[in-house]
Design a protein with these regions (language model features):
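Short secondary-structure junctions
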Residues: 27-43, 91-103
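N-terminal signal peptide c-region/cleavage motif recognized by signal peptidases
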Residues: 16-17
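Cleaved targeting-peptide boundary
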Residues: 20-27
């Protein structure tokens, strides 16, 4: 559980990080996101995230995340990590629809919602694909954010439809592109 919280905390510390103009190695909804954030890049922990050119890492509508992490306590098991993320989402956001886990032959995909209330509140849909590699547990994340103020019945239906498409899209990404992007140079 500490590993999951660590991964989420790392993603939230974007404000203290740096960004460069390097395009995402994979597309989300047919688009390459050109602004890159490079987080920790060690032998066992690596993070790169991407947003649109006109957005910031504090305020974005689409995000692509690439990660490599070591999870020896679960033997770098992708399905177990997806189950752990789903359990964490259920605990933190019990009033949201339940997470959706889809096992795959080489890993697992999990989709869940998160939100932040308040003046700048938002709803966020996250889709993670996990697989085991020689260096540890890899993940690819597609996330979308919408202001809570814009959420009505139609927007909620649109979000649900987009999630189905993102789950299918992330399952078809060539994972070698992610692994190559996370290689230490």
């Amino acid at each position: 559980m500490k590993l999951i919280r660590s991964a989420l905390t790392t993603a939230c510390l974007l404000a203290a990080s740096w960004a460069i103009a390097a395009p995402s190695p994979v597309k989300m909804e047919g688009k390459i996101l050109p602004q890159e954030f490079v987080g920790q890049m060690t032998a066992s922990e690596r993070l790169k995230e991407y947003v649109a050119a006109d957005e910031t890492f504090e305020r974005w509508t689409r995000l692509i995340g690439l990660r490599l992490q070591s999870a020896p306590q679960i033997n770098n098991d992708p399905l177990k990590m997806a189950q752990n993320m789903a359990a964490l989402a259920r605990r933190q956001y019990p009033d949201m629809p339940p997470p959706n886990i889809r096992p795959q032959k080489d890993g697992a995909v999990v989709q869940f919602y998160a939100y932040q209330t308040g003046r700048n509140g938002f709803i966020e849909s996250n889709v993670f694909r996990y697989w085991k590699g020689g260096e540890g547990l890899y993940s690819l994340q597609f996330a979308r954010r919408s202001p809570l103020s814009s959420l009505d019945g139609n927007k909620a239906k649109d979000l649900a439809s987009q999630n189905i498409a993102l789950i299918q899209e992330i399952a078809n990404v060539d994972k070698r592109q992610v692994e190559k992007a996370l290689m230490l140079r």
